[in-house]
Amino acid sequence: MSRSVNPARGEASVAGIMLRPSFAALVAAEEELGPLFALVERAAAGQLKLSEMVALFWHCRFDVGADVSRDAFSDSVTASGLVAATPALKTLLGQILGGR
């Protein structure tokens, strides 16, 4: 990650990758995962799947080289563990609900 995250912009990081929940990123995530409010509801109910979390992260990745594949990114997030991914997920879900 070449830049530091900007919390005022709703950015987070996971596995050394900056996540920026731009409109385009969230639309792409919604196309794959279904309505974002339903995603937030599943997360609140403890029903969010690992694959859904990683897909949200993948669509929100920012400033990542083309050499990083989705499989490699997924493996990196998984290797970091849920404890490391939870703060980024919380930030992105808060951004979905609150916007800025």
Where does each model-flagged region fall?
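Glycine-centered positions within short beta-strands or beta-hairpins
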Residues: 14-19
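A short local loop/turn or secondary-structure capping micro-motif enriched for an aromatic residue
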Residues: 26-29
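Residue-level signal for threonine
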Residues: 22
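A residue-level signal for conserved active-site and pocket-lining positions in enzyme catalytic cores
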Residues: 57
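Charged interaction scaffolds used for protein-protein
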Residues: 1-11, 31-51, 62-100
